[in-house]
């Protein structure tokens, strides 16, 4: 379970990283080369696509931060974890759940995000 917790925290760190070069390095370290991301509002594939959609989300939600909500859960090569998006004032704005598959190299091969109603 320690690896599940580490992956979830690294994943959210990538979403919170505002420096483009540092974010890109996190994406490359965290995701497989052909990884896929999908949620109700956006989709991306590969390091370029995932980095671009994270950057777009940051522009759409300036000053917001993601935090892990609860303990991640994992079995076999599947990981799930909840998160909360907090506004600049610290108030919870949105909650969601992501389900990820982990590739043979230990990096994320796919992430499917589910958005709950506004927090």
State what each model feature region is.
Residues 11, 31, 37, 81-83, ...:
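Aromatic side chains
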Residues 16, 58-119:
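A beta-strand edge to alpha-helix "cap/lid" segment located at domain peripheries
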């Amino acid at each position: 379970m320690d690896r599940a917790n580490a992956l979830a925290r690294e994943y959210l760190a990538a979403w919170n990283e505002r420096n483009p070069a540092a974010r890109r390095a996190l994406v490359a370290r965290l995701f497989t080369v052909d990884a896929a991301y999908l949620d109700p509002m956006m989709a991306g594939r590969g390091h370029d696509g995932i980095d671009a959609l994270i950057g777009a989300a940051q522009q759409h939600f300036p000053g917001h931060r993601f935090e892990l909500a609860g303990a991640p859960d994992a079995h076999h090569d599947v990981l799930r974890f909840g998160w909360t998006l907090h506004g600049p004032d610290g108030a919870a704005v949105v909650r969601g759940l992501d389900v990820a598959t982990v590739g043979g190299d230990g990096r994320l091969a796919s992430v499917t995000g589910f958005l709950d109603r506004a927090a």
